[in-house]
Amino acid sequence: MDGAFMLRQGAPKDLQALTDLSVEAFQPSFAEGVLDTLQTALNLPNYRSNVEDGLRKRLGVCVSLQEAGGEISQRGASSTEGQRRGCEGQYVLLVAQDCRDGALVGMVELGVLPCPIPMERRPAPDLPYLVNLAVRPCARRRGLGAELVKACHRLAKHEWGFTEMFLYVQKQNIAALSLYYSLGYVCEWQEPVWYKLKNGGQRMQRNPKMFLRKDQL
């Protein structure tokens, strides 16, 4: 990976930086303040506030992991007993920190949920679920996204004892799809393009979700 970055567990002190990162990565218009100002003027729900509230709750779940004090290295998660106890909660938020200036430039979340794919496998097994992979635009194309995903693979396999992971991505997110395919993920199911409405009509889904799974971590 090009550049000096440290992977570690997120902590409550990272709340504002992670909120900025999430908004910049997923909704750049809000990062520029344009839509945020419009929402405030119209008294609509504030996107940034919703992101911040969600992160605050999830970082609270990570407090025990942060207190364990282990950092995530390039070779895998620390296997201290304290960190293993934290992983029993089966949720972690990893951040990538620039070693030069301390800025947070990447994040990813990993939890455990019933895996809906492949659809013929029922009951659906509980498997690690990767979500909210984000890298600041200034830190992209350096392999950081791949390193965050690989860190989740190592943690899921060596700390939690799983051999599979799953996620979903929007069909039009070509960059993310390319990354996941390069790491061995396979598309198991895609949302239908057309949805039936209760009134009997149909609605087109312009950017359907694609559910991906990786076997043999």
Where do the protein language model's features map onto the residues?
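Conserved functional loop/turn residues at catalytic and ligand-binding sites
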Residues: 132-134, 143, 184
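Conserved acetyl-CoA-binding loop-helix of GNAT-fold acetyltransferases
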Residues: 141-154, 178-182
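C-terminal "cap" of GNAT-fold acetyltransferases
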Residues: 162-177, 181-217
